[in-house]
């Protein structure tokens, strides 16, 4: 798969998602019921971050037991993380930032991928390696929608998934931007609800959010 076709593939995955929940799973036992709760609420595209000791096993379990979930791996920082994501059978990968080494490794891999950027220079580096679908991170902290619009001036064809500081109150505002494919965030799976195994609450929250955001 060429870099262009991989970028088109991840663009379509992200566009179909509307919202990509960023999952930091602390307990392996939570992985499958959490994924099932999200899918039941209409949220199928999931980013499992490599931030915990159980992340790899959690992603494996979701891929094996929740076939309706489209599982990607987030917090990919280097070629070793990338190899883990590919070995798991992830459908896509996401990074919070990007080094030249990581971009080269991804370009040589078969994994659809969105590197993280926060500045024009970082975006130019991503584009130089063939990546025009990117994660804008941390979105609010890096200047918010004003910063995104400023980047869209010289880079009108870049497609973006903003993540960081996005929640129920501002998701629709971000999604209204013409270069935004979807938004990422953790508000659909609050840590307190996960700890309490409040799967029904998570499903209800997802269903409400998807109805509201897709209507907009």
PLM segments and residue spans:
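Conserved N-terminal beta1-alpha1 strand-loop-helix module at the mouth
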Residues: 1-91, 108, 157, 168-169, ...
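Histidine/lysine/aspartate-rich catalytic loop segments that bind and position anionic ligands
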Residues: 96-133, 137-142
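Shared catalytic-loop signature of beta/alpha-barrel
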Residues: 125, 141, 146-167
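Glycine-rich phosphate-binding active-site loops on the catalytic face of alpha/beta enzymes
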Residues: 92-102, 135-145, 178-201
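Short acidic active-site motifs
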Residues: 9, 58, 80-81, 101-102, ...
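Ligand-binding grooves and catalytic loops that recognize ribose/phosphate and carbohydrate rings
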Residues: 121-122, 129-132, 180, 201-206, ...
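Catalytic cores of alpha/beta
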Residues: 34, 78-88, 121-129, 166-182
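Hydrophobic faces of well-ordered beta-strands that scaffold small-molecule active sites
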Residues: 19-23, 46-48, 71-74, 93-94, ...
């Amino acid at each position: 798969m060429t870099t262009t076709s991989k970028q088109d593939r991840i663009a379509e995955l992200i566009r179909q998602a509307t919202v990509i929940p960023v999952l930091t799973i602390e307990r392996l036992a939570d992985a499958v019921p959490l994924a099932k709760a999200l899918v039941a609420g209409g949220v199928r595209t999931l980013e499992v971050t490599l931030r915990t000791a159980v992340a790899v096993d959690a992603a494996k379990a979701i891929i094996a037991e929740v076939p309706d979930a489209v599982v990607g791996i987030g917090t990919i920082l280097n070629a070793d993380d990338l190899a883990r994501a590919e070995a798991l059978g992830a459908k896509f990968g996401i990074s919070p930032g990007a080094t030249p080494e990581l971009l080269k490794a991804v370009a040589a891999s078969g994994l659809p991928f969105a590197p993280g950027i926060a500045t024009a220079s970082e975006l130019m580096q991503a584009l130089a390696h063939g990546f025009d679908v990117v994660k804008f991170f941390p979105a609010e902290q890096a200047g918010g929608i004003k910063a995104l619009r400023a980047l869209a001036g010289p880079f009108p064809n870049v497609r973006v998934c903003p993540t960081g500081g996005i929640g129920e109150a501002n998701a629709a505002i971000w999604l209204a931007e013409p270069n935004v494919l979807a938004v990422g965030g953790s508000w659909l799976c609050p840590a307190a609800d996960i700890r309490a195994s409040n799967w029904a609450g998570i499903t209800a929250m997802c269903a409400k959010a998807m109805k509201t955001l897709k209507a907009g």
